[in-house]
Amino acid sequence: GNAENSSLLNSALHYDPLVPVKDESGNYALSPTLGMIPNPVSMLEITDQTQTDRLLANGYIEATFWKDLKVKLNMGIDKNQGRRSTYLPKSTLYGKQEGGKANINENRTVDLLFELTANYTKQLFKERDRLEVLLGYSYQQENWDGLGAGSSQFFTDLFLWNKLEAGNVARPPVSSSKGKNELGSYFG
């Protein structure tokens, strides 16, 4: 039943080529010997939409305070958010077992980077002799959150994932998550 979560190509490779695409009733036929392998043509009716938006930016400011001291501030952001909506209609193997199955998942991640460095360079007695000192601080923060909702046992396939409440499930699957990681360090 869950082989529909693999791939169309996997089903096509393992499906019995002697079985017709549809049976006498007009439903997608299943192999009598490989009933757990979905009809690969039926998988073309699965609706799966993914949208991802990403912002990636970096920048820095550098200043020279004295002839020998440079300070640099480096900042960056990586913001990634996505939404995936899927619907397995009743014409598919797993969709038939579930009475149609819809899922919506959304995730968002924001990574922030902050680095501050100070570089001191002093020419000593001879041209080849010099003193270099680098000190710095680095801070990185990752924030993420997500949510998911689904339903099954729909009386029609027309709604796709747009009316999860139309499913007839006592406890539809709902999930959410949120978290944060931080990392800070001094170096020199």
Predicted feature residues:
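Surface-exposed loop/interface segments of Gram-negative outer-membrane beta-barrel transport/assembly proteins
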Residues: G1-R54, N74-S185
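A conserved hydrophobic secondary-structure block that centers on an alpha-helix together
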Residues: E62-I77
